[in-house]
Amino acid sequence: MSVLGELDLLGPRAHGAACGEAVLKAVAEDFQVDEVLDIPLSGEGEHLWLWVEKRGLNTEEAARRLGRAAGVQQKNVSYAGLKDRQALTRQWFSLHLPGKADPDLGAAEGADLRILRRTRHSRKLQRGAHAANGFTLRLTGLRAERALLDARLERIAADGVPNYFGLQRFGHGGGNLVDARSCAEQDLLPANRNLRSRFLSAGRSYLFNRLLAERVAEGSWNRAAVGDLLAFTDSRSFFLAGEEECRDARLAALDLHPTGPLWGEGDPPSGAGVLERELALAGSEPALCRWLAKAGMAHERRILRLPIQGLAWHYPEPDVLQLEFVLPAGCFATVVVREILDLVPTGQTENPCAY
């Protein structure tokens, strides 16, 4: 089986060649993620919400430990999004405890997991409920000219970056996509829920990245065309662009963006040449598109351009670059980094990115 590389799974950079190279995640503290939740918690209800800090531990394992310590089934443990194992992350979990007092969760805690806050709420934490993720990245072993770095950082702060799905969506060497293709060709879905979700996500993400890569290559990823479906940064709704919408000032302000397809049932609701391009993509991957539709996936959209909120940087040491920024939920920090620097492999088996 051939190993799929970064260009196979993502696509070209938008802002030119990398300015240099660095190491990301020499230690967990080099990659810090804080979930941003815009839900006012009531302090009462049958769901116990936990603000958890974890180090070197993935979200699913943290959820299993919390569930075991609380004595509840895994289906009663919820979280908004997956976070990388090779990082220091803080995120919310909820436990469904109807008619029960707060359990002793000491058995779940340790050097790699700490519960920082507990509160009650009337509803469980839904997947995708977080508004954003805040990142603090420490890039070490830096080999690049500061003037070039500063200019590139100023540019991506002003213009955003292509909103590719990151490498980890596809598994090591693109293995999740390989398995998704195999399932599509055999017209089957894994019985295991986690595997099914992983493979479907890999297939949809690959098709989106293919479309985005085409538009990056021709320089249209950050411009609206007649027939595009436009969406605001934090909205899942979209509307069709005519000539007037293509002149909307909110496009230049990075509030409004063209979108690409997250494939599902039916044809994309885009128009004109945009629809032709998206149907041509589907025609190049017929088995994958049929499989996604048959699995009951709804056709959705994802913004092509990723605005970077609050980007700040400094150099705490001569060979260290520290970045701080906020991204919408579901977006990947390393697609920001790849527009700045090449990452030097550290021998880790997981890809160096989180969302």
Curated annotation (Swiss-Prot):
A molecular function annotated in GO for this UniProt entry is:
tRNA pseudouridine(13) synthase activity
Q: Where does the TRUD domain start and stop, copy by copy?
A: 160-306
Q: Which GO terms describe its cellular component?
A: cytosol
E.C. designation(s): 5.4.99.27
Q: Where is the active site?
A: 84 (nucleophile)
| Superkingdom | Bacteria
For this protein, the record's InterPro entries field holds: PsdUridine_synth_cat_dom_sf (IPR020103), PsdUridine_synth_TruD (IPR001656), PsdUridine_synth_TruD_CS (IPR020119), PsdUridine_synth_TruD_insert (IPR011760), TruD_catalytic (IPR042214), TruD_insert_sf (IPR043165), TruD_pseudoU_synthase (IPR050170)
Which UniProt keywords are present, listed alphabetically? Isomerase, tRNA processing
**One Pfam family it belongs to:** TruD
GO BP, one example? Answer: tRNA pseudouridine synthesis
Reaction catalyzed: uridine(13) in tRNA = pseudouridine(13) in tRNA
| NCBIfam families according to UniProt | PRK00984.1-2 (NF002153)
Q: What does this protein do?
A: Responsible for synthesis of pseudouridine from uracil-13 in transfer RNAs.
Give the family per the record: Belongs to the pseudouridine synthase TruD family.
Q: What is the recorded name of this protein?
A: tRNA pseudouridine synthase D
